[in-house]
């Protein structure tokens, strides 16, 4: 019963502002359709000095248990139901059928970690990473899985691309606006 009053309050609050800034054109269209005025898109950028293919680390890949030439598939984020990690793990299973040398690396922590670790004992769980350590994890991967449908942007997509890692994601939010199919 609170949904409509809260939505009305937020709309009034934002409409009193000179502008409401959002990260994607899709979100701008959604808010405009709900009666928000002066909605402006400001795309986010990424730190390409930090997130770079130059941070690839063969020792880290070996620590993940990858054989030479193996395929490192990475997911970065909170290990929680809203991140749709079940789909990521099913996608990885399909990848592994084609590439038995593939290894799934999950960067992050959260309420699903224990259940995921039990269900996928071959996956590598590295916990939370930050700064240069996180950047090395991205750059040392070959493929980035981002199955979430709950993000308004998802900086991880830009971080993976800046690191030279191919992203696989839904045609949604930042992925829809930042990833191009050139094939």
Regions found by a protein language model. Name each.
Residues 3-19:
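Membrane-proximal helix-turn-helix segments that form the acceptor-binding/catalytic region
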Residues 114-132:
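Nucleotide-activated donor-binding/catalytic signature segment of Leloir-type glycosyltransferases, i.e.
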Residues 67-83, 89-93:
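Conserved donor-binding/catalytic core segment of Leloir-type glycosyltransferases
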Residues 166-169:
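Short hydrophobic beta-strand element within catalytic cores of glycosyltransferases
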Residues 14, 128-129, 136-141:
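Short alpha-helical donor nucleotide-sugar binding micro-motif in glycosyltransferases
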Residues 26, 45:
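Carbohydrate-associated surface elements
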Residues 52-66:
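A short helix/loop element that forms part of the nucleotide-sugar donor recognition site in Leloir-type
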Residues 149:
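Aromatic "clamp/platform" in nucleotide-sugar-dependent glycosyltransferases that forms part
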